[in-house]
Curated annotation (Swiss-Prot):
Keywords: ATP-binding, Cytoplasm, Nucleotide-binding, Nucleotidyltransferase, Transferase, tRNA processing
Domain of life according to the entry: Bacteria
Protein's gene: tsaC
UniProt-listed Enzyme Commission number(s): 2.7.7.87
GO BP annotation list: regulation of translational fidelity; tRNA threonylcarbamoyladenosine modification
Function: Required for the formation of a threonylcarbamoyl group on adenosine at position 37 (t(6)A37) in tRNAs that read codons beginning with adenine. Catalyzes the conversion of L-threonine, HCO(3)(-)/CO(2) and ATP to give threonylcarbamoyl-AMP (TC-AMP) as the acyladenylate intermediate, with the release of diphosphate.
One GO term describing the cellular component: cytoplasm
Taxon lineage: Bacteria, Pseudomonadati, Pseudomonadota, Gammaproteobacteria, Enterobacterales
GO molecular function, one term: L-threonylcarbamoyladenylate synthase
Gene3D superfamilies: DHBP synthase
Stored Pfam families: Sua5_yciO_yrdC
Name of this chain's protein: Threonylcarbamoyl-AMP synthase
Catalytic activity: L-threonine + hydrogencarbonate + ATP = L-threonylcarbamoyladenylate + diphosphate + H2O
Length: 190
């Protein structure tokens, strides 16, 4: 089911998230698949839909830094790392940050870190604010296929078993840049 972006429709997406369902929504460059990061069953459903191995880990996208603090080890960040991160947020840069001991492996995969982003893109911010926490965010496509850039492309690749927020992506040509928070090293060009 495709839905427009009224407050009622955002409420429908939040209900789906609270019911451990997968949703699709526009991001800065492509459509994302998202779910409740605290629900192992929701994350497993997302990984199965995308045909993505759990070992790779996932990205969390948030409306503000405070939404990420229960998942990452904030104390691992020195002043230089904080400066790099906060100079780019909110915005289209994803940072890989060490995690708290309680962060579940269904988010981190085989890593001791987690990729996180505070988005400036309004549809993502609205969803995260309405949900009250970050969302798992991974490109809406089958592993190995091109990412979907429209709601119709999401349906074409992944079917119609979940809600899709039918809005345009922000328009960036490339996925978000990914950097290591501790070193500043570029992991994926944006």
């Amino acid at each position: 089911m495709m839905i427009e972006s009224s407050s009622q429709d955002v409420a429908s997406l939040v209900i789906a998230l609270r019911q451990q369902q997968v949703i699709a929504y526009p991001t800065e460059a492509v459509f994302g698949l998202g779910c409740n990061p605290d629900s192992e069953s929701a994350v497993q459903a997302l990984l199965a839909l995308k045909q993505r191995p759990w070992q790779k880990g996932l990205i969390l996208v948030a409306a503000h830094y405070a939404q990420l603090k229960e998942y990452i080890d904030d104390d691992a960040l020195d002043d230089a790392a904080r400066s790099r991160i906060f100079a780019s947020w909110p915005g289209p840069v994803t940072w890989v940050i060490p995690v708290c001991p309680t962060t579940p492996s269904w988010l981190t995969g085989q890593h001791a870190s987690l990729a996180v982003r505070v988005s400036a893109f309004e549809p993502v911010r609205r969803l995260c604010l309405a949900f009250g926490k970050p969302l798992v965010s991974t490109s809406a496509n089958l592993t190995g296929q091109p990412p979907a850039r429209s709601a119709d492309e999401v349906r074409g690749q992944l079917g119609a078993a979940f809600l899709v927020l039918d809005e345009a992506v922000e328009g960036r040509l490339n996925p978000t840049e990914i950097r290591d928070a501790l070193s500043g090293e570029l992991i994926r060009q944006g």
